Swiss-Prot record:
High-level lineage: Bacteria, Pseudomonadati, Pseudomonadota, Gammaproteobacteria, Lysobacterales
Active site: 85, 177, 179
Species of origin: Stenotrophomonas maltophilia (strain K279a)
Binding sites annotated in the UniProt record for ATP: 231-237
Known partners and oligomeric status: Homodimer.
UniProt-recorded name of the protein: GMP synthase [glutamine-hydrolyzing]
Amino acid sequence: MTNIHNDKILILDFGAQYTQLIARRIRELGVYCEIWAWDHNPAEIAGFGAKGIILSGGPESTTLPGAPAAPQEVFDSGLPIFGICYGMQTLAAQLGGATEAADQREFGHAEVNVINPDALFKGLSDHGGEPKLNVWMSHGDHVSVAPPGFTITATTDRIPVAAMANEEKRWYGVQFHPEVTHTLQGQALLRRFVVDVCGCQTLWTAANIIDDQIARVREQVGDDEVILGLSGGVDSSVVAALLHKAIGEKLTCVFVDTGLLRWQEGDQVMAMFAEHMGVKVVRVNAADRYFAALEGVSDPEAKRKIIGNLFVEIFDEESNKLKNAKWLAQGTIYPDVIESAGSKTGKAHVIKSHHNVGGLPEHMKLGLVEPLRELFKDEVRRLGVELGLPRTMVYRHPFPGPGLGVRILGEVKREYAELLAKADAIFIDELRKADLYDKTSQAFAVFLPVKSVGVVGDARAYEWVIALRAVETIDFMTAHWAHLPYEFLGTVSNRIINELRGVSRVVYDISGKPPATIEWE
């Protein structure tokens, strides 16, 4: 079988907000890559076996003492190097060029003039054949003097060195960000570096990844049994489908129905996995335990803790019944791995971790199976489709681990959860009907623990309030509220109030992030 990790790129992270985006773009080209902190062990960098190295952007300044720098082993490797933004600045500073602080930061669209087309730029244009490109800038410093052996390949009206190249050594640098979509020829530039200059084969495809992981899982677990906590979310669902294909009936999934899931989600999970795919799923109906444990609790963090601890407790009980299980499968994905690796100096970018299963009891002496640990979320979704999971499941909006427990403000009660699940289902149903679901990044309903006066028939009613929330975002770090049509919102409001007894008012949240968070709790 072809080794899909043979041709790979190493990205050294200098703390840029876009570093993961660089990796995702390279993976989209069909080439495997990894992100390591810039201060990673130099011997491991030298021994990684990359076909090329990318130096990412970053928030530091090369004009200050102690600025992060690429290890000498990078330059000694003889490999092609591509410096992006700060990555180009440290290339210049380390190789005998000069950088300086700009009078003011440059952030946004810019026009680059290609004056000496190199292997990356040759023939590219956004202006009808003229050697000009529309790019995205985000920098304070810039290269003022290119290092010896380098040619200035592009400039702008504001900076003398927008790109540079040493074609003999195959070292390149650009001041702009090819990884963002605002740089129209960005993916073409990355392809030229990764495929043309570095010579990488495009082996990183969904079908190849599935074959590779099936072989790895079979080698890892042998004839042992594996247990998986199935939540109905994308990651655990893809793990379930992948492991079922790899080891069949040796996989047992435990699905804990907390009573805090989306409308009829428990039945949908069982229909999909147990009935349609033949996966062995143990369904634990634990709603009574959850509502009893949450009684009288209104603090959001306390609710999260109770919900998380109870899941671990129930999962532990069920795993003890499976005497032959030697392995625990988890839906850990690549951003979790980057977070745990960290940086020795603390100057590299740290991403908040969202582990699927955390805090499992120490006495659970199970080995870990993590078939998604090399993948980004978009890759996990593509794998899910390739494995035959419905697109509607694979491309569902994010759902919080504690479920409706953090979308019911204040104390959680069974009747609140049922009302909210139905209201949420109506909202999502109408979004799909209006072809707006995929145009929003996340949409959901929130139960507000306040009553509002309304008129139902000829009588006054004093009933609950439902808030609707819909946002558009690229990375979930910042978000804009979705400008849904008024007529659409009116339709959703009418359905919720007419179909749900106990709701008299529906409001729409028009807060951005920041200052508000996407979830209410």
